[in-house]
């Protein structure tokens, strides 16, 4: 399992470097890889397991590890189980695995209600004094995204070349 995951992450990283895949997704894969390493070490006292040992019980145990040891909520668990499912698909497609352990496993994402800042809360955020320059930078970046509608992921990839003070060029 971990060998498949490691190779997947190496290939994915090359695609990120080529601009074909998102860096944020790679970070998620790397995080899940680390959690799986820790899970295997703690629960099974091994560094890797054979693909044929992937069972619905293994997946449920990993889910419980994420909930209890890592204190993940349902939607984070769902987000972290998806890359494991991707590794299973890779194994099935390469005929390294003949059955899908996820066939008997189900986790549903919970519906979340997003809250929004009021104009007054935004004003307080804009005018508030923060403890240090780093907090002020994060506040300013948040406000930039809030006022422009730019996503955090897009803002993270923003470069000086993307910013124009006028559009006559």
What are these model-derived regions, one by one?
Residues 1, 163-169:
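Short, intrinsically disordered, charge-balanced linker/junction segments flanking boundaries
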Residues 2-32:
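Short, aromatic/basic-rich helix-turn unit that serves as a nucleic-acid recognition element
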Residues 12, 16, 37-44, 66-71, ...:
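Structural motif corresponding to the C-terminal cap of alpha-helices
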Residues 24-25, 31-42, 49, 57, ...:
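N-terminal DNA-binding recognition helix of tyrosine site-specific recombinases/integrases
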Residues 74, 78-82, 97-152, 156:
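Basic, Lys/Arg- and aromatic-enriched nucleic-acid-binding interface segment
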Residues 157-163:
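A short, basic/aromatic helix-end/turn motif that makes direct DNA contacts
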């Amino acid at each position: 399992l971990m060998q498949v995951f490691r190779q997947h992450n190496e290939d994915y990283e090359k695609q990120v470097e080529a601009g074909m895949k998102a860096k944020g997704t790679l970070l998620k894969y790397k995080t899940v890889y680390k959690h799986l390493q820790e899970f295997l070490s703690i629960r099974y006292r091994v560094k890797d397991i054979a693909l044929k040992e992937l069972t619905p019980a293994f997946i449920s145990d990993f889910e419980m590890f994420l909930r209890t040891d890592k204190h993940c909520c349902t939607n984070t668990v769902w987000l972290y189980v998806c890359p494991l499912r991707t590794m299973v698909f890779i194994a099935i497609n390469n005929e390294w695995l003949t059955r899908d352990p996820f066939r008997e496993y189900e986790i549903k994402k919970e519906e979340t209600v997003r809250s929004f800042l009021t104009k007054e809360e935004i004003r307080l955020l804009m005018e508030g004094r923060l403890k240090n320059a780093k907090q002020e930078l994060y506040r300013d970046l948040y406000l930039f995204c809030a006022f422009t509608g730019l996503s955090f992921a897009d803002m993270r990839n923003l470069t000086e070349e993307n910013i124009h003070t006028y559009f006559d060029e």
